[in-house]
């Protein structure tokens, strides 16, 4: 293992991350909100740590090996979440313990959107901005790692996706080099953020709210600058804008690149994963609207329509915004929505969950097993986009699903052991493992009431979900650490 190469990259990451503390610092100084000193100290600590890692190995030229890539990907979130917690920890308002600060930081960077904070409307403006910025930075990291780095390690949904689907994204790389790929993705991500912010602003949000919510919308994060989330604005137009951008952000960013290059919007509909993604959103929305209408949950049909559509898209894409308390919805709707987050969005997007592409392959494998029972001697290939999928890919999908299920059960049992009720335990793990945010029971609105051990368990859940299980678990095997 190239330890020096890993240390150098960690040092560079921390040094770059320290510069992201300057915007909230400037906002604090301008607004005199009392958080200037925490951000100054946080900046100096993070910069010093980055230089401390980088300086002794600055002259080493060895390239990281494949094995090092796994460690670097995990450290990306572990280290940044740790140092990202410092401003929360040092802040007087809000006053946060270590578990709370790390939880909030991890939730931001993994774009989970679960929060331990209450009274957001009264918090310092710099802290509010910092939370939103954490999600935006985390979202960009997710895209670059998912599309450019993880496939080289043989992990992640995009590895399955681009290797098997013909058409606009069949190439092994978007552009010849990772650096160029990252740059292309950066422009798309930045462009979507600017477009989203402008749309929010034109719809009536303040400039601060528009920028902050564009950060968490495009990142599919779910953090808001208000306790009532998007419901604070009470605007169908703003809700509609959020729905559009949540769907766009839930689609494979490599596909966005291909659409821009080909200048053909129909490219989206030619993609099997996108078709299933949109079909699932439509189907669940119809079910939700029927149940809400029959139960007379809202007196106004327009309110039924907007709340129903918004919450389905928000939860199914794992964003986690709310316009209403969906946990109070009738019948099976709350459970259905929470379970929908386990599927999530498309591979190569900022969405959480298992990803649509894996769900498609699991369904096709199930269909094949049934057909095989009827025709035992037949050779029935699984096809995606008209092209056979190798058995190794199917095995990888089932391996992921098995580990995902096992991790879910273990984490849920661990949460139950902390003393929370079953609904809270299972929904909290579901929400954090799928990077959703809001759950049911005691975590329907926030996670402030969860004990310190429970918060650490959920931090692991968030990290495990964001790293798509394999990346983190591979570090726990003795084989990985042998020379």
Regions found by a protein language model. Give the residues of each.
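Membrane-proximal intracellular helices of multi-pass ion channels
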Residues: 1-483
């Amino acid at each position: 293992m190239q330890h020096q190469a890993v240390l150098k990259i960690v040092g560079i990451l921390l040094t770059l991350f320290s510069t992201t503390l300057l915007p909230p610092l400037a906002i604090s100084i301008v607004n005199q909100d009392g958080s200037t000193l925490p951000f100054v100290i946080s900046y100096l600590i993070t910069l010093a740590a980055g230089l401390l890692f980088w300086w002794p190995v600055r002259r080493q030229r060895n390239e990281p090996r494949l094995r090092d890539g796994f460690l670097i990907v995990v450290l990306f979130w572990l280290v940044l979440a740790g140092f990202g917690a410092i401003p929360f920890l040092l802040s007087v308002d809000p006053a946060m313990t270590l578990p709370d600060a790390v939880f909030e930081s991890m939730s931001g960077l993994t774009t989970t959107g679960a929060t331990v904070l209450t009274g957001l409307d009264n918090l310092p403006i710099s802290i509010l901005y910092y939370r939103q910025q954490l999600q935006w930075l985390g979202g960009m990291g997710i895209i670059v790692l998912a599309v450019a780095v993880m496939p080289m390690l043989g992990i992640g949904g995009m590895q399955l996706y681009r290797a098997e689907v013909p058409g606009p994204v069949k190439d092994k790389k978007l552009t010849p080099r990772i650096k160029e790929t990252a740059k292309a993705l950066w422009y798309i991500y930045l462009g979507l953020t600017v477009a989203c912010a402008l749309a929010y602003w034109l719809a009536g949000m303040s400039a601060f709210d528009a920028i902050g919510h564009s950060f968490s919308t495009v990142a599919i994060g779910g953090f808001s600058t208000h306790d009532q989330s998007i419901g604070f604005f009470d605007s169908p137009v703003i809700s509609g804008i959020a729905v559009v951008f949540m769907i766009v952000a839930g689609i494979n960013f490599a596909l966005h690149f291909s659409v821009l290059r080909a200048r053909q919007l129909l490219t989206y509909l030619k993609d099997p994963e996108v078709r299933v993604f949109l079909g699932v959103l439509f189907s669940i929305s119809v079910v939700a609207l029927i149940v809400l209408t029959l139960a007379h949950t809202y007196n106004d049909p327009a309110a039924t329509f907007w709340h129903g559509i918004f919450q389905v898209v928000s939860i199914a894409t794992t964003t986690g915004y709310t316009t209403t308390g969906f946990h109070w919805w009738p019948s099976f709707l709350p459970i259905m929505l929470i379970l929908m987050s386990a599927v999530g969005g498309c591979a190569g997007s900022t969405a959480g969950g298992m990803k649509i592409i894996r769900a498609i392959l699991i369904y096709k494998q199930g269909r094949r097993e049934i057909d095989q029972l009827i025709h035992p001697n037949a050779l029935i290939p699984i096809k995606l986009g008209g092209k056979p999928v190798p058995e190794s890919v199917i095995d990888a999908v089932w391996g992921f699903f098995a580990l995902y299920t096992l991790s879910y059960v273990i984490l849920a049992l661990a949460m139950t052991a902390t003393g929370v009720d079953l609904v809270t335990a299972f929904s909290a793990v579901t929400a954090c493992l799928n990077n959703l945010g809001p759950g049911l029971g005691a975590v329907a609105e926030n996670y402030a009431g969860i004990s310190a051990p429970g918060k650490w368990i959920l931090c692991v859940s968030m990290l495990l979900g964001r790293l798509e299980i394999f990346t983190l678990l591979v570090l726990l095997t003795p084989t990985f650490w042998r020379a």
